[in-house]
């Protein structure tokens, strides 16, 4: 499933050993969408390049880019480089409150570093302990997929996608349990 791959990749791409020895930054989509006139100059400065007007346009090699037609936002503002549909999407569209709790806990260090959450180490440690047994169970979004595809839950739990996601979730949990963070986590771009 595409969603499983995206979760797995995100959990690992925010914490790569390449960030430890190379100069790398992360840029919040919200900063780019809501404050392009501050964010793009900050990116240019960090990269050591000149700010150009074309950076504010949806172009690729000088040609107009019409957006990704596979995006759920394509018909709304998919052709607007600074459209806000993607950052204003209703929470809960895919993940239940239970799913969100687990993912929010696993992404906690990233969320704190990038300013999405306030630091609360004691609550984080409590939540981390609480989610460990939950990682061995199906997420609600997985139950929905199984129901829609008419796959028996026991069979679903033997599937490659289920086992792949679990291996990543448990590895990330183990790292957080040991370090209380991701040791090689990406740092955010500082915008003045």
Locate predicted features.
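PAPS-dependent sulfotransferase catalytic domain
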Residues: 1-56, 68-75, 80
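PAPS-dependent sulfotransferases, especially Golgi type II membrane carbohydrate sulfotransferases
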Residues: 49-192
């Amino acid at each position: 499933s595409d969603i499983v791959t995206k979760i797995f990749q995100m959990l690992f791409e925010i914490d790569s050993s390449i960030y430890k020895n190379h100069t790398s930054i992360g840029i919040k989509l919200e900063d780019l969408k809501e404050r392009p006139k501050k964010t793009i100059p900050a990116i240019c400065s960090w990269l050591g390049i000149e700010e150009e007007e074309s950076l504010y346009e949806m172009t690729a090699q000088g040609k107009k880019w019409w957006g990704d037609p596979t995006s759920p936002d394509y018909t709304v503002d998919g052709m607007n480089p600074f459209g806000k549909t993607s950052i204003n999407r209703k929470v809960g569209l895919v993940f239940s409150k239970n799913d969100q709790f687990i993912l929010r806990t696993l992404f906690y260090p990233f969320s704190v570093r990038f300013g999405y959450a306030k630091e609360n180490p004691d609550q984080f440690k409590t939540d981390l302990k609480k989610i460990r047994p939950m990682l061995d169970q199906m997420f609600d979004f997985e139950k929905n997929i199984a129901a829609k595809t008419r796959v028996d839950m026991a069979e679903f739990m033997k599937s490659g996608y289920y086992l792949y996601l679990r291996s990543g979730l448990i590895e990330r949990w183990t790292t957080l349990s040991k370090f209380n963070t991701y040791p090689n986590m990406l740092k955010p771009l500082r915008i003045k």
